Amino acid sequence: MSENKCPMHHSAGGTTNRDWWPKQLRLDILHQHSSLSNPMGDDFNYAEAFKSLDLAAVKQDLLALMTDSQDWWPADFGHYGPLFIRMAWHSAGTYRTGDGRGGAGSGNQRFAPLNSWPDNVSLDKARRLIWPIKQKYGNKISWADLIILTGNVALESMGFKTLGFAGGRVDIWEPEADIYWGAEDKWLDDKRYSGERDLEDPLAAVQMGLIYVNPEGPNGDPDPFAAAVDIRETFARMAMNDEETVALIAGGHTFGKTHGAGDAALVGPEPEAASIEQQGLGWKSSYKSGKGGDAISSGLEVTWTSTPTQWSNNFFENLFGYEWELTKSPAGAHQWIPKNGAGKGVIPDAHDASKRHVPAMLTTDLALIFDPDYEKISRRFFEHPDEFADVFAKAWYKLTHRDMGPCTRYLGPEVPAEAFLWQDPIPAVDHPLVDEQDVTDLKLKIIGSGLTISEVVATAWASASTYRGSDMRGGANGARIRLAPQKDWPVNQPEQLAKVLKVLESIQSEFNKSGKKISLADLIVLAGCVGIDQAARNAGVEVTIPFTPGRMDATQAQTDVESFAVLEPVADGFRNYHPTQFSVSAEELLVDRAQLLTLTAPEMTVLIGGLRVLDTNADQSKTGVLTARPEFLTNDFFVNLLDMGTTWKPTSKAEDRFEGVDRVSGQPKWTASRVDLIFGSNSQLRALAEVYASSDAQLRFIDDFIAAWTKVMNLDRFDLRRA
């Protein structure tokens, strides 16, 4: 056999479908993180495993590691704390409010692209340093939890009192395919901006491969005023206000240093591109020893304080204590030092006790005193160190726990007793739950209320479908659909919503007078279930819709209007709601929303078919309602969509609305959106639609619709499941 002929006959490295058809709809994002990639098995319960963990012992091991400097990657100042703070920060700091994706909740820093981002240089070493501890405690602590816990212990080991720590983050085992990190194909490019400096949604970082902002200033321009603009935008997009922003920057930069000892061109490829013998490590430097005092990461060479391994107010003391002038690091990066040679000898060297340095600052540090609003906060923190410490503790806790969902998911002995508004609190259940007879009585009340099937189903869907599996916000629990801002969202049809809620509140009030109680949150879901039950009965099928009470009603005071505003759908294919034309197609937005709802392609398909025949469009239009008998739970949507007697033609310039006409007579039959027609156009979705359009599929369709509906109604019922 010729040496040049590969004996393996497989598809690896070949041309993919997406190479041929780049605009092909991606459905793979609906089928991530299954048991096929997870070595733990379906029966593994991480919450139970974590409960058996001796957290104090783990912390003791981490504490010992802080000063156990390893020759293969020596600790700056003899302490790994600053490196571990950066590791935790950069794990949590990818979170963005726009779609709730990113963050520390899945341990995704272990995988591409994050493990190889330019901003994460040397964090591969940080994770290797804590591997012996992960190895020791095994599956009792996830990588995701360990990374954040290590950052907490790092702070505590350097004299800072943290607010607490919650476990419960479940590891993923493959890179996330659903997260849009930007359209750029080069590191540190910034095609994400348009206009004056409008950052593309939902992105929260200024350049590809950065966590937040460029520390040298926008695109490397050392302008502190312009840097402040970027800082405010990016931190706001990950849920931080000005006070929290200043505290996080100053608190983080109280410790450690940056690394720019030499020419960055001497640093080798990132982990994903490194040679196999480096075993997953990257950025191998050929500058001198490549480590310790010779390390190169960001290219900046900055130590902020005279006590870089101890909590202090020295960051602000130095920031306000000197006038600053621009200089360059040995690697050629823009940074700042005191004017007129001030500050000589006040900063220790990280590896040589005989050397001393001047303080240095980043352009983004100076933004904290150049920007008037940031300056007021910085000066207050400078003059009131205790207040600074308190705000930093709360902001750090928020940073590292923001994507974990409600505090009912938090695990461990260090969970703070205090509930915070950003956790979207919901009152605990304070009454016995309704029993089977109560549910039967309430169903009869709903049936006799005069509300239509489409009204109650649409309201329940609107309530539950706000859920995002990315950060576990939203959902039916809390009944926030009756509160600002959700009650006023156009997609929720405010007039119809107010009508439905008024009727349901009347039923609730009457029932609660009996001495028993049901929350409006439960009643909204129950009403939707009643609607589906009636629709199935209309179609001649008797069904039982699962309903599990236990939801409670949040108050307006427990609901941050600005925070919840980001949950408003810009489009919702499930309700044929597309008020604005985007560069992204309506079908892509549908798949994105389905992914946030943790739906599979079959679940998405059957829900679309069911919601259409139940007549739940947001604008009450008949677009996509491909049935002559609305409010009958039938497979008519699929039957009529795949009917070869119908031809379709666009009726709008944007080709987002279509008319279906009789192939022979030319008479109009239906109207549809791109979301509707994709189930006949896309080969994978058409295959699913064919299953439900078959003559023997009616019962399967109803069963599958009810299962998918129940899943969505219970997505935020963390009390019913533990990962």
UniProtKB/Swiss-Prot annotation:
MF-aspect GO terms: catalase activity; heme binding; metal ion binding
E.C. code: 1.11.1.21
Residues that, per the record, bind heme b: 253
Gene that specifies this protein: katG
Post-translational modification: Formation of the three residue Trp-Tyr-Met cross-link is important for the catalase, but not the peroxidase activity of the enzyme.
Protein name per Swiss-Prot or TrEMBL: Catalase-peroxidase
Cellular component terms (Gene Ontology): cytosol
Role summary: Bifunctional enzyme with both catalase and broad-spectrum peroxidase activity.
Active site positions, chain numbering: 90 (proton acceptor)
Pfam families registered for this protein in UniProt: peroxidase
Cofactor note: Binds 1 heme b (iron(II)-protoporphyrin IX) group per dimer.
PROSITE patterns with a match to the protein in the record: PEROXIDASE_1, PEROXIDASE_2, PEROXIDASE_4
UniProt similarity note: Belongs to the peroxidase family. Peroxidase/catalase subfamily.
Catalysed reactions listed for this entry: H2O2 + AH2 = A + 2 H2O; 2 H2O2 = O2 + 2 H2O
Keywords: Heme, Hydrogen peroxide, Iron, Metal-binding, Oxidoreductase, Peroxidase
Cross-link (Tryptophyl-tyrosyl-methioninium (Trp-Tyr) (with M-238)) at residue(s): 89-212
